[in-house]
Every structure is written in structure tokens, then in C-alpha cells.
Amino acid sequence: MSDVKHDSAAQEFYVELPEGKALLHYEREGEKLNFHHTFVPPELRGKGLAEEVVKAGFEFADQNKLKVIPSCPYVARLVMKNPEWKRLIVHS
């Protein structure tokens, strides 16, 4: 597992590697986090990095009693594969 960092000023969870930065970008909306964009550099795709940053985002939301709006299609698909996250989901 890579070292996922949280930059609250930039509103992102990310993994920094020599090949680039894998990230989950969000917007804070009161007591909700809108997970609206994930990105992994092409040469790093298929290694589970997007899932790692999304998992870190859900753990942060859970620990801080926040809800998640899964606007990013990738995040929405991951919720289907991780039913334990469904309790954190709200829709705008």
C-alpha cells in the first residue's frame, strides 16, 4: 500500500510517486464531502492507486462524522464493491 496523504487546503487525498500524482479531489459542503474527481497518471493505472486514495477519503469522512456525495463515477462504482461505505453516502 502506498502512503496516502491529505491536503485539506487543496481538498485532495493523494499518492505522490516519481511517475506522477494519483488523487481524489473533493469539495467540502458543510458536513458533506463531494468526491467529484479521481485521477491516476496513465503509466500508473491498474495498480490500485485510485482505490487507495478513495479508501483514505472514506476513512477520513467516517472518522470525522462526515457524509460523502459520490459524484465521481469511479467512486460510485467502488461504493457498489464496498457496501460498508454505503452508510456514509448521501446524494447532494
Functional labels for PLM-detected ranges:
Residues 46-57:
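Conserved acetyl-CoA-binding loop-helix of GNAT-fold acetyltransferases
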Residues 1, 36-37, 75, 86:
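Generic secondary-structure boundary/loop-capping signal
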Residues 60-92:
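C-terminal structural segments of small proteins and small subunits
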